[in-house]
């Protein structure tokens, strides 16, 4: 598995990032995997600015482009891509986060990229929404919000037809 500095999806798609040729070890199968972190689009997913709460068409287009580039550079060449960290912070916009989660996971799957949700256990957005990626209450063994977690799961199973 290969990743770039800070696992930036932008850098792995640049000309400065390359993957070693692993064909000498097994000429019939590529075994390389690229891992990226994708909190995209930044203004919606990670920027704590509470005015950027709606998952709109411009943000959808940005995600489409990011996944398309990952597909074209890696997946189309037989190199797997896993988004090893993804999520969007809590700006009291659960319905929009659900829309984002479904779209992110489904678009990633359409382009051949798997996704792993980031949960840092931080829930408190009363002072700032910064880094509020909490989903699982470790001390209680419960998920919150259930609707968001279910959106991730449903999107990972949905038919892509």
Question: Where are each of the predicted segments found?
Answer:
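Extracellular glycoside hydrolase catalytic/binding regions
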Residues: 1-113
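Aromatic-rich peripheral "rim/lid" segments of glycoside hydrolase catalytic domains that contact
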Residues: 93-161
